[in-house]
Amino acid sequence: MKKKSLLPFAAAVLLASCGGGTSSSTPGSSATSNGGLVRPQGDKIVIYAGGSSEFAWVKGSQEDKVIEAIEDRYYEDTGNSLDFEIAYLGEDMQTKLSSELAAGSQVDIVISHTRGGNGLDDKLKGENDHYNLYDAIYDYAPNLYDAIAGDPLNSMTTSTNDTVCIPSVISPYKFGILVRKDLMEKAGYTDDPTQTDKTLVDNLQDFEAMCLEMNKLTGNSYAVTGAAWDLEKVLTLGAFSTAGYFSSGVFSEDGAELVMKGGCTTAYQDVLSTEYQWAKKGVISKEANSILLNDGESNFIAGKTGVFVLDPTIQHLIKVSRMAKAQNPDATFTVLGPLKATKGSAKKGFMRNPSATFGAAITKKSTRVNEIMSFLNWVYSSADNYNLCRYGVEGVHWVNNGDGTYSFPKGKESYATSPAYSGILTLVENQKMSNLTFKGYSEEELHWINDIAGNPNNYIENDVMDYLFTQTDKFNIIQGSATDKLYTMAVDAWTGKVDPKSLSSDGKNTVYEAAAKEYRSRVREVDQYITQQYHLMKANRG
C-alpha cells in the first residue's frame, strides 16, 4: 500500500530524464572479481557533502579503494556502471554549492545536516533547488522506502507532499556533557551521589561553582568549551524551557497555541540570562561562538578547560576523551546527564534531535535521478550491501563479530581514530538497516552511551522538530527582518556585553522583553501560518 498522503495529491511528479570537488574513483578503470570483468566507464554522479565543523565529512585513508569496490559490486549485481565524484567540504559547503549551482555545474546529491543553522532542508527548499522525491522514493526505490517510511520520511515531507531529502534514521538520543573527572573531584565536586564528602553536580548552580573552581586549578579564563547552540543542546535550555534560540516549540500566546521560535518566549529570558552570567564570570568564553571544532578539541585535550560540549554527541565526546587520555594518562573523565536549574528544581533535559538529523537531497537540475534511485534501491536491498557502503569491505576495513558489534582487522586498530572510509555512499546513516556497535568501548563508555546519552528520560519533549514547514517569500522577508534585533540582543548576552534582564530604554521592559515582544508582534502572521501546517500534518499522521 502506498504511503499516506498528507493532502490529496493532484499530479504525479515526473522523474527527470536520463542524460548525459574531488574525484573519489577512477572512472570505469577497475577489474571486478567476476571473472576479471572490466567495468566500463559509468555515468558520473557528483556529490557535495559538508556543513558546519561538526558536520563536515572527512575522506578516509582508503576512501578511493572502498568506493571503487562499491562501484564494481554494483556493476556485477546490476550491469549498471556508475562513477562517483565526491567533494568533501566543511563550513564553506553552502557557499561552494551556491556558486556551482549558479554556474550550471553538475551537482547531483547534497548531503548535510537538517533543521536550522543553515540546514540542508531549509536552504534547498527555500531556494527551490531540490528535486521533490515524494514519488521517486516509493516508485523507484522501494527498498529505500521500506527503510525510511514513517516518522523519518514524514519529517522531511511538507504539508504539500514535497519530500526535500532522504532522511537519516538514527537514534535521536545521543548527547552528554564531558567533564574532566579528576579536575571535578579536585575542585570538591562529584557526579556520584554516594560521595557525600563532595558536592553533587546535578544542577546549574553547582555546575557554575564547579567551573569557577576549575578555572583556579587550570589558570584558564573559562571552563567550558562549547558554543551557544551547544550549551542549549545539553546545558542551559532544558532547565527552563522546551525550545531555545535555535529551535521552535508549541507555546501559548494570548490564549492561542502557536509554533514559535523558542528564543522569543518568556521562559527563554532565564536561559539567556544564565548564558550572559556565565560569559561574565568565566564559565564560558565570550568568543565561544567563533571557536572552531579542532581548536576547541585542542584546548580541552591540553587541559585548558574542564568541560567539553562542542558537538556533544556521545561518540564525539568519547573520541575527545580518548585523545585527551592519550596526551595525559593521569586524566579521568565522566559524562553528566541533564542538569536542573537548582537543587530544588525538577525540570531538566537535553534537546532531542530528530531521527532525520541528516539528509541527502537531489538537486532540481540533476539528470541522474533514475540512476541515483536505482543505486539506492540496491544499497538498501540487503544488510550486506548497506554495510559495504557504510563501513567498507568486510574483513579488510572492518570485521563483523556476529554479536551486534564490529571491530577492525588486526593491525588496523588505527581505523578507530583515523577511519579508512567515511561511509559516504549510503548517503545517510540508517540504523534500521544496520546498527552495529563498536566492540572497543569500555564498560564506562557503554554506560555513557546507553544510560546517559541513550536514556529517553534525559530529553525534552518537543515534537515540532519532527515536522518540515514551508514559507512564502513574503514571510521569509518578514522573519528575516524581524530577527535582526533579537539576534543582536542574544549575541550581546552570549558575549557578556549586555544583561538581558537589565532595564531597556523604554523604562518598562527588560532588554530581552523589549526585543522579544517586538519580534513576536512582527512574526505573528508567520507563526500562525506555521501552526496551521503543524496541526494539519499532526492530524494526518494520526
Predicted segment positions?
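Sec-dependent bacterial lipoprotein signal peptides
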Residues: M1-A16
